[in-house]
C-alpha cells in the first residue's frame, strides 16, 4: 500500500510544565509527548493521540515523507527525526519532528529496497546475498524526497559487490556520506559464495543417492 500523505492532529503543550513527570501524565492519558523544532522558529511541545501515531507508524513511508501536523488548527510541515519506543513493549514514548522549509535542503534517512534477488545469477549458483544496510542518509530539498532507494541486484554474480556510488539516485538527491570531504564509499550489498556447511550438505545429499554395493552390504552383515 502506498501512502502519499500523512496528517496527524496534535495539541500545543508549550504553556504547560515540561519534564518527565508531565510526560508520564500524558502517557497515562494515551497521549505521546513530542516536539517540533527547526525552521528558524521556536520549538513547540505537543502531544499526539497514541492510536493515531501508532497507525501511521505501521507504514514504512511515514519515516521518509513530509508530514502535516495540525497543531490546534495550525498546519506544520515536518519530517520525523527521532522516535523513542518502550524498550519492552515497543509503543512510542516520544517523537521529534523537524520543520521543513520550502527550497531548504534536509538530511533524511530513507529505506533501501533490494530487488531482483531471486533472479541474480549468484543466487541461482547457490550464493548468498548479504545486505549491509537498511537505510541510507541522503540530502535533498523536501519536494524531491524519495520514499525509498531501490537497488537492483538481479545482475550480481558471486563475488560482486555494490557500493554507495553505484546507486542510481533520483534527480536532486545526493548521498550524505559521498558529499563529505572524507567521503566513505562503503559497500552496501555483496554476493558471497556458498558456506562450507551448505557445500557439505549438498555432498551428503549426493552421497545418499549412491546405492551400496553388494560387497559392502555383505561385509556389514558378517561384521567384517
Curated annotation (Swiss-Prot):
One example of a Gene Ontology biological process annotation: translation
UniProt keyword list: Ribonucleoprotein, Ribosomal protein, RNA-binding, rRNA-binding
An annotated Gene Ontology molecular function: 5S rRNA binding
The entry assigns this protein to a family as follows: Belongs to the bacterial ribosomal protein bL25 family. CTC subfamily.
The job of this chain, per UniProt, is described as: This is one of the proteins that binds to the 5S RNA in the ribosome where it forms part of the central protuberance.
User: Could you tell me which species this protein originates from?
Assistant: Psychrobacter arcticus (strain DSM 17307 / VKM B-2377 / 273-4)
Protein name stated in the entry: Large ribosomal subunit protein bL25
- What interactions and quaternary structure are annotated? Part of the 50S ribosomal subunit; part of the 5S rRNA/L5/L18/L25 subcomplex. Contacts the 5S rRNA. Binds to the 5S rRNA independently of L5 and L18.
Q: What HAMAP family does the record tag this protein with?
A: Ribosomal_bL25 (MF_01336), Ribosomal_bL25_CTC (MF_01334)
Origin, by domain of life? Bacteria
Pfam families for this protein: Ribosomal_L25p (PF01386), Ribosomal_TL5_C (PF14693)
One GO CC annotation: cytosolic large ribosomal subunit
Amino acid at each position: 500500500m502506498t501512502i502519499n500523505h500523512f496528517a496527524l492532529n496534535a495539541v500545543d503543550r508549550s504553556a504547560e510544565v515540561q519534564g518527565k513527570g508531565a510526560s508520564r501524565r500524558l502517557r497515562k492519558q494515551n497521549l505521546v509527548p513530542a516536539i517540533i523544532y527547526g525552521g528558524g522558529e521556536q520549538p513547540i511541545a505537543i502531544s499526539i493521540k497514541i492510536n493515531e501515531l501508532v497507525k501511521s507508524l505501521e507504514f514504512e513511508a511515514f519515516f521518509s515523507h513530509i508530514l502535516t501536523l495540525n497543531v490546534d488548527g495550525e498546519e506544520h510541515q515536518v519530517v520525523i527525526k527521532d522516535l523513542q519506543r518502550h524498550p519492552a513493549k515497543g509503543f512510542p514514548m516520544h517523537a521529534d519532528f523537524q520543520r521543513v522549509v520550502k527550497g531548504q535542503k534536509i538530511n533524511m534517512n530513507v529505506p533501501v529496497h533490494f530487488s531482483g534477488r531471486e533472479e541474480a545469477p549468484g543466487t541461482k549458483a547457490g550464493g548468498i546475498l548479504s545486505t549491509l544496510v537498511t537505510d541510507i542518509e541522503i540530502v535533498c530539498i523536501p519536494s524531491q524526497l524519495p520514499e525509498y532507494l531501490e537497488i537492483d541486484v538481479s545482475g550480481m554474480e558471486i563475488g560482486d559487490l555494490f557500493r554507495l556510488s553505484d546507486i542510481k539516485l533520483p534527480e536532486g538527491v545526493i548521498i550524505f556520506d559521498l558529499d563529505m570531504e572524507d567521503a566513505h564509499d562503503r559497500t552496501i550489498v555483496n554476493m558471497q559464495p556458498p558456506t562450507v556447511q551448505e557445500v557439505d550438505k549438498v555432498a551428503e545429499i549426493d552421497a545418499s543417492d549412491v546405492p551400496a554395493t553388494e560387497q559392502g552390504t555383505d561385509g556389514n552383515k558378517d561384521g567384517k
